Amino acid sequence: MKKGLIFIAFSTLFFSTMEIAIKLVATEFNPMQLNFLRFLIGSIILSPLAIRHLKGSGFSLDKSKVLYFLFSGFMCVVVSMTFFQMAIVYSKASTVAILFSCNAVFVIPFAYFFLKEKLTKLSILSLASSLIGMICIVNPENLTNVTGITLSLLAAVTFALYGIIGRKGSLKFGFDGVVQSSFSFLAGSLELLLLILVTKISFVANWLQSVGLSKFSNIPVLQGISWSSVPALIYLGVFVTGLGFSFYFLAMEATSASTASLVFFIKPALAPVLALFILGEAITLNVFAGIVLILAGSCVELFSDNRQAKLEKLAQAHALAKQAVGSTNQAHFR
């Protein structure tokens, strides 16, 4: 258990500094370029752990698995993380960190509609508390950054959809989170590279500039990388994306999925504090109220998950006991 808590601590630290590290180099890299580089590096760092998980499992790539990884990678890296990168450009790192952490809350209704998972009263309470917290942070009465808020929420919603895709893939193909992430990150990085190369075609680049999408025109791949930006790039690729997810999955192995999810429940509180000290981003009263409500909602959901897991274990134990009694009665009858 102690080892699991250490893994959670490191994963929380890396994930909580993600938006801050990106903000520090936002002016040195194109958002799409940085997205491509950090997930490519992250997939390489995750690969040894994924290979270890696949040993002796009889896993083999076929057309359906390749298509699945291409789809999940596209949803995560190309769609969700592009919204995420752009959100950090247009909004404060602390705001993006808090709103993006709500992706776990958006999973609740998606799981109900797409996975037919039961929607409990506690889940509804968690969802309501987190939504009110988001409204406090957004502050509709003084909404001055519509673009940044919208991009942050789009990143959270699409990442929640990626989580649902991951669950469906796990149920269908039987691989775990580390394999899912490693292959999806690699597939998504290659897809993003292809799109980046397309933006370099002259007529495509000219059209993107003419419609006001200059950030998506002629996107660099390696250009602009300097000695001053290399440490931040290594931190984002190796530590945040690679080791952050590695420690998260190792925490799952050492504890449980619900305990490991504490990473995303602590982040909304820790990230703004780190942003205050590193970037000087002030925590206003409405943001503080939003953090408290989101943390409350997250705690309710964690309690709900633990309660549901205990009920399932009791049901399984009851079924096994009933089966054992039935077998004993049959043997006695004979």
PLM region spans:
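Loop-to-transmembrane-helix transition segments
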Residues: K3-S11, G58-F83, T147-A155, W207-L243
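Specific alpha-helical transmembrane segments that line the substrate/conduction pathway
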Residues: Q33-I44, F84-K118, S123-I124, A155, ...
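Transmembrane alpha-helices of multi-pass small-molecule transport proteins
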Residues: E28-V79, F106-V107, T158-I165, S181-F203, ...
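Hydrophobic transmembrane alpha-helices of multi-pass small-molecule transport proteins
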Residues: L46, F110, L119-N139, L151, ...
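C-terminal-most transmembrane helix of multi-pass membrane proteins
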Residues: F39, A50, S229, S261, ...
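Helix-helix packing/entry segments at the starts of transmembrane helices
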Residues: L37, T95-C102, G166-L190, G237-F277
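Glycine-/small-residue-enriched transmembrane alpha-helix faces in small-molecule transporters
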Residues: M1-F36, L143-K168, L190-L194, L311-R334
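Specific transmembrane alpha-helical segments of multi-pass solute transporters/efflux pumps
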Residues: T17-A21, I51-T95, L99-F100, I108, ...
